[in-house]
């Protein structure tokens, strides 16, 4: 399907971006076109990141991370490209599990 991932766009820009896409679809004769809007935040880490971890943009407890993702959804994002920080494969897998077990149920 069709979609767009605005790179570096702030939440307040999403409604305008979506409007531009809808108008372009209308002008192309596709008034009922459906499309996905993605969000790709910087690196994420569930919990308090260790001091020796490279910087992560989306950090905090599961409630905070879920609130941030819900805010993205409220402005029109419906596809989330998340990438988690981890110093080892085990830590990375722990982050993935924490997202599935602790954050996803809050979405």
Regions found by a protein language model. Give the residues of each.
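Active-site-adjacent structural elements that line small-molecule/cofactor binding pockets in enzymes
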Residues: 1-107
């Amino acid at each position: 399907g069709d979609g767009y991932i605005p790179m570096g766009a702030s939440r307040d820009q999403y409604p305008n971006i979506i409007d531009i896409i809808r108008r372009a679809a209308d002008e192309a004769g596709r008034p009922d076109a459906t499309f996905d809007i993605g969000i790709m935040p910087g690196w994420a880490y569930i919990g308090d990141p260790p001091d020796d971890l490279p910087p992560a943009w989306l950090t905090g407890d599961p409630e905070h991370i879920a609130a941030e993702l819900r805010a993205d959804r409220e402005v029109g994002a419906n596809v989330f490209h998340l990438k988690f920080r981890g110093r080892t494969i085990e830590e990375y897998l722990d982050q993935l599990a924490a997202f599935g077990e602790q954050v996803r149920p809050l979405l």
